[in-house]
Amino acid sequence: MQCPYCQHTDSRVLESRSTGAGRSIRRRRECLSCKHRFTTYERIEFVPISVIKRNGQSEAFDRSKILRGMVRACEKTTVLPSTLEAIAEEIEAQLQQKPKRSITTAQIGDLVLHRLRQESEVAYVRFASVYRQFQGVDDFIETLSHLQDNAEQANLWIQTLNEDEESEDLTSPSVLTPSAN
């Protein structure tokens, strides 16, 4: 490891600790040339997940986008920021475990909706209104009426998504989609 002070390439490890729930290692090092101490972090590098947007374009997965959307949906609710951080981390971990390295924004939205519904129905409806692009009051009314009716269907779809790793069909119809009237 190169010393940030003198750029010498030899250092020794003084201390190592696991951090971030075992996802990274913090190492305290000492340069063998100038004796300065510095800290390095080692973490697993994941194969990037590609997100296919509604317009067909593809971009790298960005967990902060999920978090921003959930924070806006949960404003003035009892859902804690730490809970939202945990949900975003859980969704990212779930996606990292999948053998397929691409997912649609609709599927990510469904995963977020599923978790938000467990935390707050208000946050669920707020997120759904943006994610599903509600056009009017009828879309809200329909979603509210489907909130209880389709709970079982949503849970089954999420369970199928989690279990079906070999023949993963990432074009499953979304649940709770307001119909165009």
Swiss-Prot record:
Span of zinc fingers (unnamed): 3-34
Keywords: ATP-binding, DNA-binding, Metal-binding, Nucleotide-binding, Repressor, Transcription, Transcription regulation, Zinc, Zinc-finger
One BP term from GO: negative regulation of DNA-templated transcription
PANTHER family cross-referenced by the UniProt entry: TRANSCRIPTIONAL REPRESSOR NRDR
Signal sequence segment: none
Matches recorded under InterPro entries: ATP-cone_dom, NrdR-like_N, RNR_NrdR-like
Keyword Translocase part of the UniProt annotation: no
Originating gene: nrdR
Bound cofactor: record note: Binds 1 zinc ion.
Cofactor(s) the protein needs: Zn(2+)
GO terms of molecular function: ATP binding; DNA binding; zinc ion binding
HAMAP family xrefs: NrdR
UniProt function note: Negatively regulates transcription of bacterial ribonucleotide reductase nrd genes and operons by binding to NrdR-boxes.
Similarity comment text for this entry: Belongs to the NrdR family.
Protein name: Transcriptional repressor NrdR
The keyword Zinc is assigned to this record: yes
Domain ATP-cone: 49-139
